[in-house]
Structures are given as structure tokens and as C-alpha cells.
């Protein structure tokens, strides 16, 4: 029997978090379908508004509008399933995207491509459109024990908040990772499995 995935008060029937693929791949259709089947559907906010009529003139406004539209539609398709977003820290106007996702009712916000040091602040105190009093779960993407500890210590000190989960991306993940070209040329020699084991042993309530 497949074990459920528990993230605070959220329960996914299957321990599957669909990847956030940008520029029109991970939108409401895919995320809503994954969530409806018991996984966690993820919408990528990267250039999400490319189909909006004013995208070429005002991409920031178009993207924020699309973030809300796609989350609303995904949640309708999900029929109670878990819908989240992936927001890159490198995105211009990053905090605006976080607020838009939180307002639209995203259940989970995953953030990488940099250290999401302002994520808890941007996501807190946001009035959800559905009227629910519930903050989105927050997750940094990390590639090392060092980066995990840095973000947890910072969040705890500044916001008295710790990640609800941590996403680990290794050298084979194909994402925005903390590895240089030389390291990637010798992936087998990295012994990254050992780093994953050390990451899995971090007590999220007690960063070292």
C-alpha cells in the first residue's frame, strides 16, 4: 500500500509532487488533473501570462492575472485536491507573485532558483479570495545541507517560521541548482546520495 503524504493539515493520497515546468507546461490543466487523482499539482509561474492579451505590453500585470486565473481553475478541476505553485526567486517582482498565489488560494508555495529568504513575509497576512483563514504551506528548494540550514536559520530568526517541507534537487534534477559546471562533469564522483541522506536527517524543527 502506498503511503500518503502528510504536510501539516494537508494530505495527499499519493506521495507525488508534480514538477513545476515553466512557460505554459505546468498550468491548471496538468496541475488540476494531478491533484484530482490524489497527488499534488504544481503550477509554474514562469512567464505564465504569455497568453494574456496585454502580455507583450505589460508582462508583469499579465503574469499576476494569469497566476490567479490558473490557480482558480486548477482548484476547480482538483475537486478538493492539493494545488500549489512553483515561483522562482529570480523572478522580477518575486514577492508580488507570492502574494498573488496566496490570495488565489494556493495550498503550497515551492520556491527555488535562489534562496527564498522573503517567502514567509510575502505569504503572511494575505486575505484569501475564498475567505478561508489558512496560509499556504511554504517550501524552499535546496541542493545541500548548507543551503537548508541557512534558510531554516534565517526564517526562524526573522519570522519565527520553519519550512513546512523541503524540496531537495540533486545534480540530475535539471532545475535551477547550486552546482557548478565542474561538479556536473563528475556527477558520479559527487556521491550525492550521501548529501541526500544528511538532508533527510535534518530535524526541520531544530536546524543545526
State the predicted function of each range:
Residues 1-200:
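Active-site entrance/lid segments in N-terminal catalytic domains of soluble metabolic enzymes
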Residues 202-208:
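Residue-level detector of conserved catalytic or cofactor/ligand-binding positions
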Amino acid at each position: 500500500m502506498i503511503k500518503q503524504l502528510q504536510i501539516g493539515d494537508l494530505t495527499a493520497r499519493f506521495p507525488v509532487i508534480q514538477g513545476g515546468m515553466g512557460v505554459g507546461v505546468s498550468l491548471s490543466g496538468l496541475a488540476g488533473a494531478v491533484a484530482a487523482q490524489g497527488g499534488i499539482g504544481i503550477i509554474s509561474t514562469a512567464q505564465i501570462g504569455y497568453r494574456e492579451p496585454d502580455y507583450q505590453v505589460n508582462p508583469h500585470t499579465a503574469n499576476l492575472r494569469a497566476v490567479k486565473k490558473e490557480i482558480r481553475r486548477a482548484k476547480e478541476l482538483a475537486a478538493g485536491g492539493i494545488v500549489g505553485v512553483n515561483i522562482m526567486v529570480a523572478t522580477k517582482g518575486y514577492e508580488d507573485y507570492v502574494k498573488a498565489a496566496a490570495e488565489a488560494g494556493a495550498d503550497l508555495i515551492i520556491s527555488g532558483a535562489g534562496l527564498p529568504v522573503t517567502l514567509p513575509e510575502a505569504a503572511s497576512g494575505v486575505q484569501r479570495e475564498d475567505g478561508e483563514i489558512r496560509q499556504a504551506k511554504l517550501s524552499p528548494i535546496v541542493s545541500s545541507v548548507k543551503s537548508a540550514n541557512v534558510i531554516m536559520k534565517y526564517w526562524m530568526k526573522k519570522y519565527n517560521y520553519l519550512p513546512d517541507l523541503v524540496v531537495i534537487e540533486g545534480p540530475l534534477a535539471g532545475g535551477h541548482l547550486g552546482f557548478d559546471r565542474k561538479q556536473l562533469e563528475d556527477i558520479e564522483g559527487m556521491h550525492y546520495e550521501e548529501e541526500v541522506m544528511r538532508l533527510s536527517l535534518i530535524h526541520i524543527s531544530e536546524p543545526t
